[in-house]
């Protein structure tokens, strides 16, 4: 018996999340606790990478806020994620979109896949 696998299965959230990949624009509803109050924050941006495997899988979302790029890493199995919605399906040729960090304006746009 592998004790690590037993512990991972016990703490797994088993949420049904939509499938998405790098280049997709998604909205993550994330639960934030401030003091004794709790609220849900919507974080919308482009997925620039998906890394890890299994329960340790995580994804990085990049958004522009007041002309400043903000990146946030979310674990897939986080109990604080309320929901994930896919807004746009991007058309990219790379798995990791680190080159978006250096681009600004219209150059940083990603082509949209026709659905």
UniProtKB/Swiss-Prot annotation:
InterPro entries: Ribosomal_bL19 (IPR001857), Ribosomal_bL19_CS (IPR018257), Ribosomal_bL19_sf (IPR038657), Translation_prot_SH3-like_sf (IPR008991). GO terms for cellular component: cytosolic large ribosomal subunit. Signal peptide: none annotated. GO terms for molecular function: structural constituent of ribosome. GO terms for biological process: translation. The keyword Ribonucleoprotein applies. It comes from the Bacteria. Keywords: Ribonucleoprotein, Ribosomal protein. This protein is located at the 30S-50S ribosomal subunit interface and may play a role in the structure and function of the aminoacyl-tRNA binding site. HAMAP family: Ribosomal_bL19. PANTHER family: LARGE RIBOSOMAL SUBUNIT PROTEIN BL19M (PTHR15680:SF9), RIBOSOMAL PROTEIN L19 (PTHR15680). Belongs to the bacterial ribosomal protein bL19 family. This is Large ribosomal subunit protein bL19. It comes from Parabacteroides distasonis (strain ATCC 8503 / DSM 20701 / CIP 104284 / JCM 5825 / NCTC 11152). The gene is rplS.
């Amino acid at each position: 018996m592998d004790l690590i696998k037993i512990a991972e299965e016990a703490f797994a959230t088993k949420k049904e999340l939509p499938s998405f990949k790098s280049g997709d624009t998604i909205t993550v509803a994330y639960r934030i606790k401030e003091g004794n109050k709790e609220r849900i924050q919507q974080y919308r941006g482009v997925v620039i990478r998906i890394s890890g495997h299994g329960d340790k899988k995580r994804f990085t979302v990049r958004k522009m806020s007041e002309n400043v790029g903000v990146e946030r890493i979310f674990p897939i199995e986080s109990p604080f994620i309320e929901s994930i919605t896919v807004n746009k399906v991007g058309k990219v040729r790379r798995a990791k979109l680190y080159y978006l960090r250096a681009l600004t304006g219209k150059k940083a746009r990603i082509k949209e896949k026709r659905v």
